[in-house]
Amino acid sequence: MQILKDRIRKDGKIKGGNVLKVDSFLNHQMDIKLFGEIGKEFKRRFADAEVNKILTIEASGIGIACIVAQYFDVPVVFAKKNQTKNIAGEVHTTKVESFTHGRVYDIIVAKEFLGKGIFRKRR
C-alpha cells in the first residue's frame, strides 16, 4: 500500500534493534485518514472473502482494526495480553513475541467470540 509506505518513509524512525517507530501516526497518535485508506485497502484485497470478524491484539492494533471492521460491517475481537477475571469459560491461547517490548506474551481470546472458518473465499 503506497500511502502507508510513503508515510513510513516520511515519519517512521528506525530505533535500536531494528525497531520501526511509527508512534506519530499509527500507534500512539493515530492518523484516522490514513486508517481509512488502510481500511479501504483491506476491503479491496479481501473483497472475495467471507469476513465475519476482525481479530487483532490489544493496544496498537485496535485502532486500525476498528476502521477496517467498518468497511466489512463486522465486529472486532482483540486478544488480551493478560488473563483477567472477566474472561470466563473456554479460551484460545498462544504465545506472541513482542519485538518492541522484548518479551513473549501468552495472549488470550474467549472462544465464544470466535467461530469456525475464520477465513474462506466466497463462492
Per-segment meaning from a language model:
Residues 30-34, 55, 97-102:
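Short, flexible loop segments at the rims of nucleotide/cofactor-binding pockets, characterized by
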Residues 51-58:
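Short glycine-rich phosphate-binding loop at a beta-alpha junction
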Residues 42, 55, 72, 78:
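A glycine-rich, hydrophobic loop/mini-helix early in the fold
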Residues 74-121:
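Short, glycine/charge-rich flexible loops or terminal/linker lids adjacent to PRPP-binding catalytic cores
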Residues 63-72:
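Short Gly/Thr/Asp-enriched flexible loops that form oxyanion-binding sites at enzyme active sites
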Residues 1-51:
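Active-site-facing substrate-recognition patch
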Residues 55, 121-122:
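Structural motif
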